[in-house]
A protein has these predicted regions:
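Short, surface-exposed loop or secondary-structure junction motifs
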Residues: 69-71, 76-80, 133-342
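Short, glycine/proline-biased beta-turn/loop segments that scaffold the active-site neighborhood
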Residues: 118-134, 225-226
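Short, conserved catalytic-motif segment at the N-terminal edge
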Residues: 35-95, 115-117, 130-134, 177-183
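N-terminal secretory signal peptides and thylakoid transit peptides that target proteins
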Residues: 1-18
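Peripheral terminal and inter-domain segments
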Residues: 372-572
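Short, small/polar residue-rich loop motifs at catalytic or cofactor-binding pockets
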Residues: 56-59, 336-338, 413
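Active-site SXXK
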Residues: 42-48, 62, 68, 94-119, ...
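Short, well-ordered beta-strand elements
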Residues: 340-358, 468-472
């Protein structure tokens, strides 16, 4: 990449590379793997056993598809502890949010049938649906299936009924109805924010139009055609299985076996079936001689037309191996006692999945080394995509640095931007994280470089009268909302806030999950350190990252989660 990147091409060049030619493939009869692949598989077995030791993972299963063939399926551990049935390639696991990939395919099949339109307002199919917004009138009229599947409709992550915290599942219909009680975090279509609700709503639209349940649609249009006999989203089916893995979570003797998040997190499947699904995706929607999903719709799903790194139910990571730009397509899952990693790469004609019965960092590392070495063997060693010599950082003015300095909040946690001794900005993620150079090539475009030499780009969006400043990141999950600017104005310090101050508990499945403090600083309210920047009516407030905090009723909520008071301010 010779020369210096211009201001307007920087984000595009750093965040995306051309996809290689797409080579159709399918899953064929397993064949003897090459020595190289066999040795990598053998090494990965050691990685898996190491990940399971000491992490609480008692059951895991994996699959590897390469060159149109199933190279590896294997189970590890036992479905519910020592002495129970050993895990094998047919053991069923919950894949949680990896289900969103299936949801996108399910909706696109209905688009292929002509019964759904990706870009029509969802009110065409759900005329009575409404959702609350402080930014615009009738936001539902602007929400499309495309925005739902791309996490760009503005929804929060949890619903009042049926979420990752409540003990009893109210059922999918009640869960979807409760979405109308939620408040959008941002104006429709303006930002990426990961959300279960958008996918569940999209699946509900599909049910209404198709006239059958979402699990039945998956069975008829995906699982049966692909021969995925161990797969279902029907709770009555997976609960009846005597060889399904049992989810586990630290602090809980039991994890609820049924999730109300049927679309966004409800698929159960096996390693053998995931290999078949990987073959379908690597084949561009083809399975054997059958084109199940038209190529144009496969491209729609993986086209990333709205920008960022999230397409329709799939994420991308761009890498460079040797001189070859490589796109990894993936979607993780985690919750209700399970975790899943799921990655496919069409340039290498390879895909990998791992499922495990505890969502731990050790589990999410399974397969990383294997895929990296496969790609290195195919294309050459991994290289940084954007040479630092191509970047020409500038020194920001004092005013520009001042507007970015302060605390920020994002889905991946809290962050702080400060000025280092050399006069450059530093980005700190996490309470004790070392700073990373936060350099600019223009007043509103900045970048960081990670330990692998990869560039992450940010675009600064100034504050408006309704929202704080925002840093849009090429890695969508790392976007940041400004929480506390340096030398920001003093808040209104409303007297009616005083009775609410104190310490609160959020329960998950009937047990304490986290404790948060509602406090007042510099005239502003803060919950868990996040500033409440707007009060649209007495008792209804919104945080700097767009979440609703509601003290109007007898049961206060934050992010639609119930707050149980532990002690007033100054006590407990």
């Amino acid at each position: 990449m010779p020369g210096t990147l211009s201001r307007r091409t920087f984000l595009a060049n750093a965040a995306a590379v051309p996809a290689a030619t797409l080579i159709p493939t399918g899953v064929a009869t397993p064949a003897r793997p090459s020595v190289t692949t066999a040795s990598l598989i053998d090494a990965e077995r050691g990685v898996i056993r190491s990940a399971m030791d000491g992490s609480g993972i008692g059951a895991a299963a994996v699959c590897l598809v390469e060159g149109g063939q199933v190279r590896w399926t294997e189970g590890f551990g036992h479905v519910s502890g020592q002495g129970s049935v050993p895990v094998d390639a047919s053991t069923m696991f919950s894949i949680q949010s990896t289900s969103k990939n299936f949801a996108a395919v399910a909706v696109l099949l209905a688009v292929q049938d002509g019964i759904l339109d990706l870009d029509a307002p969802i009110t065409r199919y759900l005329p009575s649906f409404t959702v609350r917004s402080r930014f615009e009138h009738a936001p539902q009229e602007r929400i499309s299936l495309r925005l739902l599947l791309a996490n760009r409709a503005g929804f929060t992550h949890e619903a009042p009924l049926g979420n990752n915290y409540e003990l009893a599942s109210p059922g999918f219909d009640a869960h979807v109805r409760s979405i109308s009680q939620t408040w959008l975090r941002f104006p429709v279509g303006t930002r990426y924010r990961y959300s279960n609700l958008g996918f569940d709503l999209a699946g509900h639209v599909l049910e209404q139009v198709a006239g059958i349940s979402y699990p039945a649609w998956l069975q008829r249009r995906i699982f049966e055609p692909l021969g995925m006999h161990d797969s279902t989203a029907d709770a009555s089916v997976y609960l009846a299985s005597k060889v399904r893995a049992l989810g586990t979570q630290e602090g809980h003797t039991q994890v609820p076996p049924v999730t109300p998040l049927v679309v966004s997190g409800g698929v159960w499947t096996s390693a053998a079936d995931m290999a078949k699904y990987l073959g379908f995706l690597l084949g561009g929607g083809r399975s054997g001689a059958q084109q199940l999903l038209e190529p144009r719709l496969w491209d729609e799903m993986h086209g990333f037309g709205l920008g960022g790194d999230y397409g329709l139910g799939v994420m991308r990571s761009e890498r460079l191996y040797g001189s070859t730009p490589v796109r990894l397509l993936h979607h993780r899952g985690g919750g209700f006692g399970f975790g899943c990693v799921f990655t496919y790469c069409r340039q290498a004609n390879a895909g990998f999945a791992a499922m495990f019965n505890r969502a731990t960092s050790a589990g999410y590392g399974i397969g990383e080394r294997l895929l990296d070495q496969l790609l290195s063997a195919r294309f050459g060693p991994r290289q940084p995509r954007v040479p630092l010599s191509s970047l020409a950082p500038i020194r920001l003015t004092q005013d520009q640095m001042q507007q970015m300095a302060g605390s920020w909040i994002g889905r991946s946690g809290k962050a702080k931007i400060g000025v280092a001794g050399n006069g450059e900005l530093q980005l700190h993620r996490g309470a004790h994280a070392e700073g990373t150079r936060f350099a600019a090539i223009d007043g509103d475009q900045l970048f960081t470089v990670d330990t692998d030499g990869e560039v992450a780009t940010y675009r600064y969006h100034a504050a408006t009268d309704m929202l704080p400043a925002y840093l849009e990141c090429s890695n969508g999950e790392d976007g940041l909302d400004q929480n506390d600017p340096i030398d920001g104005p003093t808040g209104p310090q409303a007297p009616h806030w005083q009775p609410w101050l104190g310490r609160y508990r959020v329960d998950q499945w009937g047990r304490p999950s986290m404790f948060v403090v509602l406090e007042q600083r510099h005239g502003w309210l803060y919950i868990d350190g996040i500033r409440l920047v707007a009060e649209v009516e007495p008792g209804l407030l919104f945080t700097s990252d767009g979440e609703a905090v509601d003290f109007r009723g007898s049961q206060p909520t934050w992010r639609n989660l119930r707050l149980r008071r532990v002690a007033p301010m100054g006590q407990g």
